[in-house]
Amino acid sequence: MSKTVVTCALTGVLTDPAQHHVPVTPDQMAREARAAFDAGASVMHVHFRQQAPGKGHLPTWDSVVASEIAQASREACPGVIFNQSTGVVGPDISGPAACIRAIRPEIAACNAGTLNYLKLRDDCKWAWPPMVFDNPVEKIQAFLDVMGGTGTRP
């Protein structure tokens, strides 16, 4: 019998919890991770969200929040492979790097090139203004250096 790896992305990067049910808090993330784990997922891809009321649709690189989410998810899902998002616009990777250093995920996203970040609504209008998600080689190498220092696989 062949083996299959199932990855669950617990949230999208900019999904609004007021419009779609997405977990935000460490307890919510752990609960949803456990449901996915019980359904067969062995990898959890995670975007961290701001914890202030009404701000759960926005990303955060607060390493304390990341640590709380990672700890709660790992306790809920023993042996789960934690996959941290690293997507950040611009050259400053200090936020995602701090989270990688704090939680030491087994794997982390490594965006291997620049791309257009686009999202359409059902009416074919932009959900937000199109933006360039820049990932020059120097930025990728900086992420690889951080990942190498923590034993995180890209």
Spans of features found by a protein language model:
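Glycine-rich tight-turn/loop motif centered on a GG-T
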Residues: 18-26, 52-69, 120-134, 152
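Active-site mouth loops of central-metabolism enzymes
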Residues: 8-31, 85-93, 129-132
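Hydrophobic faces of well-ordered beta-strands that scaffold small-molecule active sites
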Residues: 6-8, 44-46, 80-86, 106-110, ...
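Non-catalytic positions within long, well-ordered alpha-helices that form the structural scaffold/packing
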Residues: 30, 34-38, 101, 148
